Amino acid sequence: MVRDIEDEIRDEKNPRPLDEDDIALLKTYGLGPYSAPIKKVEKEIKDLAKKINDLCGIKESDTGLAPPSQWDLVSDKQMMQEEQPLQVARCTKIISPNTEDAKYVINVKQIAKFVVGLGDKVSPTDIEEGMRVGVDRNKYQIQIPLPPKIDPSVTMMTVEEKPDVTYNDVGGCKEQIEKMREVVELPMLHPEKFVKLGIDPPKGVLCYGPPGTGKTLLARAVANRTDACFIRVIGSELVQKYVGEGARMVRELFQMARSKKACIVFFDEVDAIGGARFDDGVGGDNEVQRTMLEIVNQLDGFDARGNIKVLMATNRPDTLDPALLRPGRLDRKVEFGLPDLESRTQIFKIHTRTMNCERDIRFELLARLCPNSTGADIRSVCTEAGMYAIRARRKTVTEKDFLDAVNKVIKGYQKFSATPKYMVYN
């Protein structure tokens, strides 16, 4: 007993040093299970804060710039000299092409014409006569080729976001959908079928019929279905104030379409610019006729159209110019007539697909109560039925709401309907 006490006193006076295992064990005291990830994140935050402070410069400075001792004026000046702004010019002629001594005649707008050479970064095969180029401001050497100039209003006609309309949303147009897909989708997806038969695929479609029968809706479904570039043009957009502006927009439109791998151009309300030519003695419609003639030339003129499909929609096919309607320009004419009983029933089911309706609604009965109605009229009936349910503070639409809506829209608005008049034109 006394000996053990003496050994403990001796150990306290002469403690033994800690080895590596003891030190590692002591470091783990007070640490949780997520200590290592937390330390790693704290280190990353600290490094990021240091990087931000270095980029921000001096906080006390009004400009936020680094101190003058850290400025590198020589490298900044060299960088400015290397990245000089270029001037836009047009290459009008190539002298001695395909040789080492080739020279290029450029026209700098509002300055002069120059005979220049190529820069170090440009290949001779990249430059063609008539194209826009970027030249430096000192020697006017060609530095880069530029794309053709296109009006921003023409560029904005391209549909970037695909519409959310599919072929299943177009009711009562089964035959029209098949004809449209044969012209648009089949040549793009299976061109070898036309090559084996030795025929050219149809390149244009004219959709005509009364208002509200689904012409524009089907074009939106085509834009959703295909991966080709889709350009939508409203006829009135091409009617410009100044002489030659509309024809220029048409040329730039087809020039942009030819630059794409595959393109679909949809002219909505084409009767605004495609009317038959006549002389009113005043000359007020001369500009519209020039625009129409440019479209006729682009559709099937001296230059090939390329892989461009053209869709046109109108309510008045009788007013269009015969030169616009001939085969080769518009190969197929698709009529959008009034839907029959089965088609009207299908349209009712399409428009009520997202509505909270009772299950026992007789859509065929509603379709029988809407004779000679278009798809737009049926959609208006569905919307009005929902309004009746909202007025009654109900969460579901009943069949009585649809019957009241039919009585209001189909019978009450009959005097505003222009369908009989347009049926005469079509």
Swiss-Prot record:
* Species name: Arabidopsis thaliana
Q: What's this chain's function?
A: The 26S proteasome is involved in the ATP-dependent degradation of ubiquitinated proteins. The regulatory (or ATPase) complex confers ATP dependency and substrate specificity to the 26S complex.
Q: Where in the cell is it found?
A: Cytoplasm; Nucleus
Q: Where does ATP bind?
A: G209, P210, P211, G212, T213, G214, K215, T216
Any Pfam family matching the protein: AAA
Encoding gene (name): RPT1A
Name the GO cellular-component terms.
Answer: cytoplasm; nucleus; proteasome complex
Question: Gene3D superfamilies, per this entry?
Answer: 1.10.8.60, Nucleic acid-binding proteins (2.40.50.140), P-loop containing nucleotide triphosphate hydrolases (3.40.50.300)
Q: What is its main location?
A: cytoplasm
Q: List, in alphabetical order, the Gene Ontology terms for molecular function in this entry.
A: ATP binding; ATP hydrolysis activity
Locate residues linked as Glycyl lysine isopeptide (Lys-Gly) (interchain with G-Cter in ubiquitin): K400, K415
List UniProt keywords, sorted A-Z: ATP-binding, Cytoplasm, Isopeptide bond, Nucleotide-binding, Nucleus, Proteasome, Ubl conjugation
The name of this protein is 26S proteasome regulatory subunit 7 homolog A
InterPro entries named in the record: 26S_Proteasome_ATPase, AAA+_ATPase, AAA_lid_3, ATPase_AAA_core, ATPase_AAA_CS, NA-bd_OB-fold, P-loop_NTPase, PRS7-like_OB
The text of the family note is: Belongs to the AAA ATPase family.
The organism's superkingdom is given as Eukaryota
Hydrolase found in the keyword field: no
Q: How does it assemble?
A: Component of the 19S regulatory particle (RP/PA700) base subcomplex of the 26S proteasome. The 26S proteasome is composed of a core protease (CP), known as the 20S proteasome, capped at one or both ends by the 19S regulatory particle (RP/PA700). The RP/PA700 complex is composed of at least 17 different subunits in two subcomplexes, the base and the lid, which form the portions proximal and distal to the 20S proteolytic core, respectively.
